[in-house]
Amino acid sequence: MTNILVIGASRGVGLETVERGLREGHHVRAFARSADRIPLDDPNLERFAGDALKANDVRRALEGMDVVIQTLGVQTGPEMVIRGTKLFSKATRVLVEAMQTEGVARLIALTGFGAGDSRNQGGCLYDLGFNAVLGRVYDDKNVQEHLIRSSDLAWTIARPVILTDRPATHRYRVVLDPADWRPGTIARADVADFLVKQVTSDEYLRKAPVLIG
């Protein structure tokens, strides 16, 4: 059994990751501001209410943990499209510093296709639409990835394409070669499956694959 801290655990990929981790027999500490609302019941689940931007909360949550899975997300409304966000970079800066202080080395982080060197790799029309709608949000994910890559942590970055609520297929592709990167869709449950598999694997250590359903 591995002790996993999931940050951003109350919904979306984060909630799917908590559920998947529990199914695999791990002890999961589910970190979110609304952790008490997580609709799961398992003896290996520990709810932890906290703010990912507060260093004290994050340091306390790291106590006794072996691995961190960071699954932060934002609601992409009109204001977010126009103004962007600093959530990803601010929370990651707090997390990396806290992990180094607390001696927790393994970080598995969720960003997305379009972050880092996967930007503008979807084809002309896709990239135009993506940059118009998500460009400012992904500018901050670029900073998030840079902070992780620049650290001395044992990191893996997962970059899924467009997320859906379909059931897991377990037939998704993990793509490292930029020549094979393509836009598409992937189930959140499949992304969670990949994230949890990295808890006990170093196959993608210090790599940033694109996940395609």
Give the role of each language-model region:
Residues 88, 140, 158, 186-196, ...:
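Substrate-positioning beta->alpha
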Residues 167-172, 198-207:
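Glycine/proline-rich active-site loop of Rossmann-fold NAD(P)-dependent oxidoreductases
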Residues 5, 36-94, 98-101, 200-203:
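NAD(P)H-binding glycine-rich loop region in Rossmannoid oxidoreductase-like domains
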Residues 31-37, 160-162:
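Short, polar loop motifs at secondary-structure junctions
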Residues 27, 35, 78-79, 90-136, ...:
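Conserved Rossmann-fold NAD(P)-dependent oxidoreductase catalytic core, especially the SDR/UDP-sugar
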Residues 4-24:
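N-terminal Rossmann NAD(P)H-binding glycine-rich loop of SDR-like oxidoreductase domains
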Residues 145-167:
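Conserved beta-loop-beta element that borders a ligand/cofactor-binding pocket
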